[in-house]
Amino acid sequence: MAENSEGLGTVPEHERILQEIESTDTACVGPTLRSVYDDQPNAHKKFMEKLDACIRNHDKEIEKMCNFHHQGFVDAITELLKVRTDAEKLKVQVTDTNRRFQDAGKEVIIQTEDIIRCRIQQRNITTVVENLQYAFPVLEMYSKLKEQMTAKRYYSALKTMEQLENVYFPRVSQYRFCQLMIENLPKLREDIKEISMSDLKDFLESIRKHSDKIGETAMKQAQQQKTFSVALQKQNNVKFGKNMYINDRIPEERKENELKQGFEEEDENEEEILTVQDLVDFSPVYRCLHIYSVLGDEETFENYYRKQRKKQARLVLQPQSNMHETVDGYRRYFTQIVGFFVVEDHILHVTQGLVTRAYTDELWNMALSKIIAVLRAHSSYCTDPDLVLELKNLIVIFADTLQGYGFPVNRLFDLLFEIRDQYNETLLKKWAGVFRDIFEEDNYSPIPIVNEEEYKAVISKFPFQDPDFEKQSFPKKFPMSQSVPHIYIQVKEFIYASLKFSESLHRSSTEIDDMLRKSTNLLLTRTLSSCLLNLIRKPHIGLTELVQIIINTTHLEQACKYLEDFITNITNISQETVHTTRLYGLSTFKDARHAAEGEIYTKLNQKIDEFVQLADYDWTMSEPDGRASGYLMDLINFLRSIFQVFTHLPGKVAQTACMSACQHLSTSLMQMLLDSELKQISMGAVQQFNLDVIQCELFASSEPVPGFQGDTLQLAFIDLRQLLDLFMVWDWSTYLADYGQPASKYLRVNPNTALTLLEKMKDTSKKNNIFAQFRKNDRDKQKLIETVVKQLRSLVNGMSQHT
């Protein structure tokens, strides 16, 4: 049983080995067979038995397979026997085909002979080509030269000529066609020189026409660059908290009519920045320069180019006669010059030797002298400050543009200081008209206000500070008239306008502050002062207006310190800075006020004269009317009303005006008595005249203007009083006895005055008392008068001898 079980276990293993032998590559059978012998003893016998059994099985399968395919094999043999017949037929056909090929080969032999003859001809042609191989490149190069000439590729044509002369012509120089080509080359070179020179002339004419466009583009780019730099500086100043007035001097609402007006027609959208190469085709210059360089005549080309450009420079620098009339004339002049030198700068940097730095510097110095002379001459015709300002802005952009190209422009900025003085003069003329208009429109009455809004509106224009005035209830009146805030505003406008010119001059804040203060001083001391004086002297300006003018000048004088603070704020320069110029407004308004005071005195006296001219005395009346004359009472009432207006004036001014008026009235009354055309005066007329003088004395004693001490004002009439008392009392003995004594009762009576009046009364006595000589009293009075007249004459003669 054990053997059986062992045998049963071995059989599957042998089957596995057999399957592995059948399915494994022959090279790997060794290990498999070795495993047969590694097993139990006699295992290989069993394996051999198993192998024999497997072989028998395969033989049986092969036999079955052969039996299955035998009929097919028999059929194939039968078919093969049938093909033999067809093979014999095929042999006959192949033989026939071979015969026909032999017949056809005869024609091929003939064609082959023809080919041999062609080969011989080809060899001959090759020999000829080999002999002409040196001639064909010459012809090709010459043909290329013609094509280059036709295509206007002259520089390449010249290079081709050099190759022909140096490389190709020596190889075929023995041929006649080569000699003809050699003779034709100089003519071609001359043609190239003429054509290139013609192109250069066209180029020069083109850039002359397009210089203004080139210059306009360059100036616009310079302005954009400057605007960017200023904006960047503003940003930095804001970041570090610096004062912004110098870089942003004018408020936003005041920035119209700036330099951008010259280029505002351009599209402000983002666009490609054009360069001089985009606007001008410089290829003619390059070609001509290269051509003349190749021809060895570069110096001739350089001399011609520089000569022609100098001629164009003189034409560009020649301005139009009416250039000073509009800013466009100046702009066109500047853009042409900029365009010219931008082109020269480009030529300087892209070519070698055509123009040099020394040449451009010489050309620029010549041009700069001419430009300065032209601007100095034409700017002198400008009377519009806006035009002068636009000219300044153009000069600044012009200078900045050329400075960016390396040209020195310091002399242009020096010229701007000359133009600045002219600009200030035009501003002064303009503001003279502004001041005149303000004075013409003023009503010369205090500014009325009825509410807080109106009060703030005035305060916002003029720095008025008065605590007492602020405490007053509405409605109330400012002491000054409308012209004061208007003038103050216009002075600030003038400072703004003057500041506009100072921008972009590359000057320090201290220099700008000094310029502003000097120009403002000129405005105050010359323009405003002149306008005030002319206003004061106008015939239609009355006493009320003059009083208001004095009040106005007082407030304007007080506002000068605010103007100084205003300048300090916009320049950021402290008033305590050394060498800071002060404003002379104080002296200006003081002078104007003194002139107005003098005019008040003059007009007041003129008004008194007008009233005095209305006097209509009856110098022969026997008795007085018993009341003062009507003209005099009207005059006194007028003086009272006028002196009430004077209450707003400084005390000394009102007192001086009042004293001057009383003295002038006293003098006018005295002159009326002593008038040479008045021949006779009666005692009744003297008494009536005395009534008028009494009214004058009463007026003086009523203190029409406060501030007089005692009877100071009455002393204005002391001469008249003593004279009239002398004649009214007829106190000649006392006068003659005390004459010359300091304590004399009639110290103010001049003997000559008394003599003149006494003679007028003497003549009246004679005329009215023809028969009075028969009365004793009248005779005694007449003798007394004659005696007094003699004594007075002796006093007068003594005074004249003493004198």
Swiss-Prot record:
Q: Where in the cell is it found?
A: Cytoplasm; Cytoplasm, Perinuclear region; Cell projection, Growth cone; Midbody, Midbody ring
Chief location of this protein within or outside the cell: cytoplasm
| InterPro entries linked | EXOC6/Sec15, EXOC6/Sec15_C, EXOC6/Sec15_C_dom1, EXOC6_Sec15_N, EXOC6PINT-1/Sec15/Tip20_C_dom2
Which keywords does the record carry? Cell projection, Cytoplasm, Exocytosis, Protein transport, Transport
In terms of Gene3D superfamilies, this protein maps to: Dsl1p vesicle tethering complex, Tip20p subunit, domain D (1.20.58.670), Exocyst complex subunit Sec15 C-terminal domain, N-terminal subdomain (1.10.357.30)
- Keyword Ubl conjugation attached: no
Q: In Gene Ontology terms, what is a biological process of this protein?
A: exocytosis
UniProt subunit comment: The exocyst complex is composed of EXOC1, EXOC2, EXOC3, EXOC4, EXOC5, EXOC6, EXOC7 and EXOC8. Interacts with CNTRL. Interacts with RAB11A in a GTP-dependent manner.
Q: Which family does it belong to?
A: Belongs to the SEC15 family.
Q: What is this protein called?
A: Exocyst complex component 6
Organism name: Canis lupus familiaris
Q: Which gene encodes it?
A: EXOC6
